């Protein structure tokens, strides 16, 4: 019983991290190196200058984006690239955690409905 459960946990964790790496690679390969349409420019500027974006804003993203813009090394032209890389990594983490949430909920429903003793 423990070996089956441990095997499931291992494969679940590995699959989640694989999805993170795969989606991060896809996001990085299709990354916009400058400002794109809609609110991207406002969020990049807000992160670079550490200002408030339009309400309701995204204060945590703005603060983390400011840290990301510091990796540009003072080059203003690279600030947009750094914030876009941050957005890609955040999206990849969201995909990984969404996978883990779905597998957790499905496992809960599966175990509660069928009462299998193997899991």
Residue ranges and their predicted role:
Residues 21, 115-119:
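Transmembrane and membrane-interface helices of multi-pass
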Residues 1-10:
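Short, Lys/Arg-rich, polar N-terminal cytosolic tail immediately upstream
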Residues 48-49:
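Juxtamembrane helix-capping/reentrant segments at transmembrane boundaries
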Residues 9-37:
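Transmembrane signal-anchor helices characteristic of membrane glycosylation enzymes that use polyprenol
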Residues 26, 31, 65, 69, ...:
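Membrane-water interface at transmembrane helix exits
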Residues 68, 79-89:
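Membrane-embedded glycan-lipid processing machinery
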Residues 17, 85-114:
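Transmembrane-helix motifs of polytopic, lipid-linked glycan transferases
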Residues 31-43, 53-65, 81:
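Extracytoplasmic catalytic/substrate-binding loops of multi-pass membrane glycan-assembly enzymes
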């Amino acid at each position: 019983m423990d070996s089956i459960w441990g095997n499931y946990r291992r494969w679940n964790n590995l699959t989640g991290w694989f999805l993170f790496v795969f989606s991060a690679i896809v996001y990085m390969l299709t990354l916009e190196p400058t400002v794109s349409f809609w609110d991207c420019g406002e969020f990049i500027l807000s992160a670079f200058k550490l200002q408030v974006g339009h309400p309701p804003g995204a204060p945590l993203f703005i603060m983390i984006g400011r840290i990301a813009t510091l990796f540009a090394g003072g080059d203003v032209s690279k600030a947009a690239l750094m914030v876009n890389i941050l957005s890609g990594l955040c999206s990849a983490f969201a995909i990984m955690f969404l996978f883990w949430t779905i597998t957790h909920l499905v496992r809960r429903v599966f175990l509660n409905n069928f009462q299998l003793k193997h899991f």
